[in-house]
Amino acid sequence: MKIVLALGGNALQKDSKDKSAEGQLETCRQTAVSVADLIEDGHEVSIVHGNGPQVGQILASIELAHQVDNGNPLFPFDVVGAFSEGYIGYHLQNTIREELLKRGIEKSVDTITTQVIVDKN
């Protein structure tokens, strides 16, 4: 069976107090166990994910760095969105691949970055 999992950006940030990359990586590891269970049961799994909290954190970091030293560039919101997609996809791809390898499952895990149009309003 083909299964599509939709993970909200908040789902990748289990503890609202811990917004660190390490905390989000640990949440991805926990998610990877469930995904690997589905794959081990013979399902084809695709994952889509949000990025709300992560894109906000990245944007705030970029803006703060620019305030400290205006030589640090600002980036348009679509580019910051791509940063967050790459970062989340990287964590999910690696943790799922690691979990599959632990189980002796040789499957490709791939990440696709999308493009979005953000409404000015």
Model-derived features: positions:
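Generic secondary-structure boundary/loop-capping signal
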Residues: 4, 9, 52, 72-76
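Ligand-binding beta-strand-loop-alpha-helix segment within the catalytic cores
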Residues: 65-121
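Short glycine-rich or small-residue beta-strand-to-loop segments that form or flank ligand, phosphate
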Residues: 45-54, 78-79
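N-terminal glycine-/serine-/threonine-rich phosphate-binding loop
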Residues: 1-48, 58-64
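General beta-strand structural signal in soluble alpha/beta enzymes
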Residues: 5-7, 47-49, 105-113
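N-terminal, well-ordered alpha-helical segments
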Residues: 33-36, 53, 57, 86, ...
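Short, active-site-adjacent cap segments at secondary-structure transitions
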Residues: 11-13, 52-56, 117-120
